[in-house]
Amino acid sequence: MEHYLSLFVKSIFIENLALSFFLGMCTFLAVSKKVKTAMGLGIAVVVVQAIAVPANNLVFTYVLKENALVQGMDLTFLGFITYIGVIAALVQILEMFLDRYVPSLYSALGIFLPLITVNCAIFGGVSFMVQREYNFPESVVYGVGSGISWALAIVLMAAIREKMKYSDVPPGLRGLGITFITAGLMALGFMSFSGISL
């Protein structure tokens, strides 16, 4: 149990997908203008990541891994396209759910919801799971933790950007300039966790 707890904490703080690996920056910068929208996208990423990482673990273990289907057959070269297919299917299901039951969030997320399909944070979480050879329970914990890590980062960024609206930012830095500086400072803050060994 302690191993899973340390993996969970490590995936949120020490190996934060947005602020340690800089994955998913496109949507991270574009949707982090309002906390409400950022929280909605963060929850969507947590849901997709929590399902995509374990689902792709099963696909890798029982289909793609060497000797999984047939003795002597190695289908790991199909990994990337298979993982993207699984992620795309999950995002389509989430998109239909939000359109039907939470239309306000669906319209607020706009084009960025389908972009979760190709969000490199989602794909990065799946790739790290395969690379680190996590078993199924570890992949569930890592999927939830890495999704929360990205959601935490985007909500923090949105909260800071909402406060910066009322700040006296120099004209040359307004908009994305100060946002990049803020993201860098946040990354430095999260880098302080890297010295912690769990």
UniProtKB/Swiss-Prot annotation:
Assigned EC number: 7.2.1.1
Entry membrane topology: Multi-pass membrane protein
Catalytic activity line of the entry: a ubiquinone + n Na(+)(in) + NADH + H(+) = a ubiquinol + n Na(+)(out) + NAD(+)
Lineage top rank: taxon: Bacteria
InterPro entries linked: NqrDE/RnfAE, NqrDE/RnfAE_oxidrdctase, NqrE
UniProt xrefs under HAMAP family: NqrE
Protein's recorded name: Na(+)-translocating NADH-quinone reductase subunit E
